[in-house]
């Protein structure tokens, strides 16, 4: 069954605002309350009144946590946010023949699409895709709608650069070492992968990186350099860039956007690429996975160290962030064996250019990158085979977890990635 709780959030909120009659111009279009008008005056008009004409857009920004009193007012950004949310949502459909945009008080008309009209599709297309995204789905034309009005693309990419980060914890953690600004250890191999690296650590240093464009699997790689990797569009070419990319770092490139079949999805993805040129740095060790954002475009993430799991988490530029805690993963796995918790998630998700997590289903995200530690992923596979009887004695369970970990993270590691891998987020 397909459950679009994310879409319901916008739908229910907007219906409540219309019924409140607090926003000038936001009214029902018909008695059946299946269509509504929303004011659409351009901010450049002489008679534009921000308090009136932008009130519903501001309310959405406040509701989403993107604006609070005292912040700089950005009515154009507020409007773009709500417009793109409406265009992406399968719950709404613009009724263009009823909209009036060339009058003194312009407005658009949207129809609330009945649930029975909304088809829950399992996949975006043939081949590997995000076939299980937390029981969420989206209209196949969601990103197409985003591209209908050419200005929306530039404004949308403007949001990518302008939006503030969500509130962070008041008590900050101790600073994390910046491995990329340190000299690589001479005991580690710099070119030939992890051959000479300590066997106890080799499984931690390798990462499995999987790329999804608009929900479709477009590429994957298992890294082998113990110092980490740089994920970007091209090889660094100037001296300044090389300061961030020592020779010991493996270079991992984003797959080409040419793999995207839909022309408009391809167009906006290429535009987004323009803001991701410098990419991000990734490092994995016994403690976990760490990232450093270098690119201009925003990067959002989810992992087992995220503070707020129900709101977007943005990476600050040039700051090293721990996005996966290996010890926490194994503690949660032990709790699962003790029948005291859920099966832990081994994955980190990176979303480039778009807020994440939010109400937009994952299939509508332009660029998603999944990152996992190689040995932890293999532990998950083995644990999934052996955890069918969670009522084993505690001492047996602890020994079982230890044995699985030792077998997988030892010197003889087996290949991980399966070509038909599907991701459940």
From Swiss-Prot:
PROSITE patterns: IRF_1, IRF_2. SUPFAM superfamilies: SMAD/FHA domain, Winged helix' DNA-binding domain. CDD domains: IRF. It is found in: Nucleus; Cytoplasm. One of its GO terms (biological process) is defense response to protozoan. It comes from the Eukaryota. Its main location: nucleus. This is Interferon regulatory factor 8. InterPro entries: Interferon_reg_fac_CS (IPR019817), Interferon_reg_fact_DNA-bd_dom (IPR001346), Interferon_reg_factor-3 (IPR019471), SMAD-like_dom_sf (IPR017855), SMAD_FHA_dom_sf (IPR008984), WH-like_DNA-bd_sf (IPR036388), WH_DNA-bd_sf (IPR036390). Pfam families: IRF (PF00605), IRF-3 (PF10401). PANTHER family: INTERFERON REGULATORY FACTOR (PTHR11949), INTERFERON REGULATORY FACTOR 8 (PTHR11949:SF7). Disulfide bonds: none annotated. Gene3D superfamilies: 2.60.200.10, Winged helix-like DNA-binding domain superfamily/Winged helix DNA-binding domain. Residues 7-114 bind DNA. Plays a role as a transcriptional activator or repressor. Specifically binds to the upstream regulatory region of type I IFN and IFN-inducible MHC class I genes (the interferon consensus sequence (ICS)). Plays a regulatory role in cells of the immune system. Keywords: Activator, Cytoplasm, DNA-binding, Nucleus, Repressor, Transcription, Transcription regulation. GO terms for molecular function: DNA-binding transcription factor activity, RNA polymerase II-specific; DNA-binding transcription repressor activity, RNA polymerase II-specific; RNA polymerase II cis-regulatory region sequence-specific DNA binding. Belongs to the IRF family. It comes from Gallus gallus (Chicken). GO terms for cellular component: cytoplasm; nucleoplasm; nucleus. The keyword Iron-sulfur does not apply.
């Amino acid at each position: 069954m397909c459950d679009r709780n994310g879409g319901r959030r916008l739908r229910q909120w907007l219906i409540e605002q219309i019924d409140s009659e607090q926003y000038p111009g936001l009214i029902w279009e018909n008695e059946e309350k299946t269509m509504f008008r929303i004011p659409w005056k351009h901010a450049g008009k002489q008679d534009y009144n921000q308090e009136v004409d932008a009130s519903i857009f501001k309310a959405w920004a406040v509701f989403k946590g993107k604006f609070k009193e005292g912040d700089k007012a950005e009515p154009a950004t507020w409007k773009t946010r709500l417009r793109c949310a409406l265009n992406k949502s399968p719950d709404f459909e613009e009724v263009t023949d009823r909209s009036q945009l060339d009058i003194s008080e312009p407005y658009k008309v949207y129809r609330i699409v009945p649930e029975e009209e909304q088809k829950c599709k399992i996949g975006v297309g043939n081949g590997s895709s995000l076939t299980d995204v937390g029981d969420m789905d989206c209209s196949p034309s969601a990103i197409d709608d985003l591209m209908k009005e050419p200005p929306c693309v530039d404004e949308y990419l403007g949001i990518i650069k302008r939006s503030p980060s969500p509130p962070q914890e008041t008590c900050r953690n101790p600073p994390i070492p910046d491995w990329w600004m340190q000299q690589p250890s001479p005991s580690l191999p710099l070119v030939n992968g992890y051959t000479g690296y300590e066997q106890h650590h080799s499984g931690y240093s390798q990462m499995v990186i999987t790329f999804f464009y608009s929900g479709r699997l477009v590429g994957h790689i298992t890294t082998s350099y113990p110092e980490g990797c740089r994920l970007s569009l091209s090889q660094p070419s100037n001296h300044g860039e090389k300061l961030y990319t020592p020779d010991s770092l493996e270079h991992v490139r984003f797959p080409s956007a040419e793999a995207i079949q839909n022309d408009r999805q391809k167009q906006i993805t290429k535009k987004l690429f323009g803001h991701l040129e410098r990419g991000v740095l990734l490092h994995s060790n016994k403690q976990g996975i760490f990232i450093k954002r270098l690119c201009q475009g925003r990067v959002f993430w989810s992992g087992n160290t995220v503070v707020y799991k129900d709101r977007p988490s943005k990476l600050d530029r040039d700051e090293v962030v721990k996005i996966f805690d290996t010890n926490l993963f194994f503690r949660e796995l032990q709790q699962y064996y003790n029948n005291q918790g859920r099966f832990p998630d081994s994955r980190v998700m990176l979303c480039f250019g778009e807020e994440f997590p939010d109400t937009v289903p994952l299939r509508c995200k332009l660029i998603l990158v999944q990152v996992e530690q190689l040995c932890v992923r293999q532990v998950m596979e083995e644990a999934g085979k052996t955890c069918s009887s969670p009522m084993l004695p505690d001492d047996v369970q602890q020994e079982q977890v230890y044995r699985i970990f030792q077998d997988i993270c030892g010197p003889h590691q087996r290949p991980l990635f399966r070509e038909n891998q599907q991701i459940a987020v």
